[in-house]
Amino acid sequence: MASSLLILCLVLVSLASSALCAAPRRPVDVPFGRNYIPTWAFDHIKYFNGGSEIQLHLDKYTGTGFQTKGSYLFGHFSMNIKMVPGDSAGTVTAFCLSSQNAEHDEIDFEFLGNRTGQPYILQTNVFTGGKGDREQRIYLWFDPTKAYHRYSVLWNMYQIVFLVDNIPIRVFKNLKELGVKFPFNQPMKVYNSLWNADDWATRGGLEKTDWSKAPFVAEYKGFHVDGCEASVNSRFCATQGKRWWDQTEFRDLDSFQWRRLKWVRQKFTIYNYCTDRTRYPQLPPECRRNRDI
């Protein structure tokens, strides 16, 4: 009996360890000024609690944004965001990584506003070598205007994982053997912004921004950056292969994470470029390998 209980305990510990091992490290929340600087329209950024929380304001004159001080090759980046409440049609709240040249790499979270009572749409995209057109859109399973939620990117040599409250919503694998470009040698800064995009953001541009509701306000906190900092000209990370996100358990999702991703895919996906045969009669190679992600 004792030996059976011991075996059961060992199995449970093993299962718990395997379920936890692939979860990104817990983000470290820091004040805005630790990692970030304003990018434009400085007077449209409001600071609270010693810079631990900020607001971005959008009016008919301008939006605003901020970026990291450094550029990074691989890492874990997250932001706690509370979206613009009420009638947010035409607005875009963005959290993304991007390099700085014509053939740039980019990893995007874009939150598309909507009319009061209609759900936000989260659009993700990946650019490699200046080419994007890899849009996926989902509804969120909560109201992102009521409370802060954490949006994260885990980026290593093997995959890019988009996470919402630590739940994977998308994976972009390194499939260089198929000729698919992958972001691996262009340092990227992290950018956050609130701006008007009523020419496309809501119902393809049919719903315009109602400026009588301005200013539109998005709230940010957390400001977590755990990446390998590189100069803009550097094409490699000095500690490549040695950071926690490079280890074996982060080269793929574990079984629990795959189930959560499948749940998002089945319940909340409203557009996936991999299933758009009108747009892509010949599926992109990454879609032929991984149509479910």
Curated annotation (Swiss-Prot):
Post-translational modification: Contains at least one intrachain disulfide bond essential for its enzymatic activity.
Alphabetical list of SUPFAM superfamilies matching this protein: Concanavalin A-like lectins/glucanases
Signal peptide, first to last residue: 1-21
Disulphide bridges: 228-237, 274-287
EC number(s) from the headed UniProt entry: 2.4.1.207
Description of what induces expression: Up-regulated by indole-3-acetic acid (IAA). Effect of IAA is not affected by mannitol. Not up-regulated by fusicoccin.
Active site per UniProt: 106 (nucleophile), 110 (proton donor)
Keyword Transferase listed: yes
UniProt-annotated glycosylation sites, renumbered to this chain: 114
Entry-linked Pfam families: Glyco_hydro_16 (PF00722), XET_C (PF06955)
Subcellular location: Secreted, Cell wall; Secreted, Extracellular space, Apoplast
GO CC, alphabetical: apoplast
Keywords, ordered alphabetically: Apoplast, Cell wall, Cell wall biogenesis/degradation, Disulfide bond, Glycoprotein, Glycosidase, Hydrolase, Secreted, Signal, Transferase
Marked site: Important for catalytic activity: 108
GO molecular function: hydrolase activity, hydrolyzing O-glycosyl compounds; polysaccharide binding; xyloglucan:xyloglucosyl transferase activity
Family, per entry: Belongs to the glycosyl hydrolase 16 family. XTH group 1 subfamily.
PANTHER family for the chain: XYLOGLUCAN ENDOTRANSGLUCOSYLASE/HYDROLASE PROTEIN 8-RELATED (PTHR31062)
Function, in words: Catalyzes xyloglucan endohydrolysis (XEH) and/or endotransglycosylation (XET). Cleaves and religates xyloglucan polymers, an essential constituent of the primary cell wall, and thereby participates in cell wall construction of growing tissues.
Name this protein carries in UniProt: Probable xyloglucan endotransglucosylase/hydrolase protein B
Organism: Phaseolus angularis
